[in-house]
Curated annotation (Swiss-Prot):
The keyword Cell inner membrane applies. It is found in: Cell inner membrane. The keyword Cell membrane applies. The lineage of its organism: Bacteria, Pseudomonadati, Pseudomonadota, Gammaproteobacteria, Pasteurellales. This is Uncharacterized protein HI_0850. It comes from Haemophilus influenzae (strain ATCC 51907 / DSM 11121 / KW20 / Rd). It is a multi-pass membrane protein. Pfam families: RseC_MucC (PF04246).
Amino acid sequence: MLRESAVVISYENGIAKVKCQSQSACGQCAAKNSCGTSSLSELNGKRGEHIFNVETLMPLREGQIVEIGLEEKSMLLSALLMYVVPLLTLLIVTMLSDYISDNEILRAILIFGLTALSFILVKSYSRKLGQQTEFQPVLLRVLS
């Protein structure tokens, strides 16, 4: 199970709204002061904040730090959907477009259009998956 600490923003009727910050391994090692990659990553500004609703029977207070978890299977399937499906669509459509038309502009439009469509379909499917309980984070423990 993937674990992450989060801060409780609000709690109402068994639903805690928690906020966690996305972490990056870059900038955490001993060589971060002399590393160009770490310097470049600082130019991006703040890391993203993510807000989740977590069901819990334990009453929580605003500001408490909790640990939430997500099954690895959920994360792997999400990554597979987001990265592999559009990439495979791009590669397959590129190969098949050779047989469909000799006009390169038409082929480029077909390739980009179907790849964009695959991103849209993945996004809508991932929203449906996000509603399922195995894709929802769970409260593991209260840290403070």
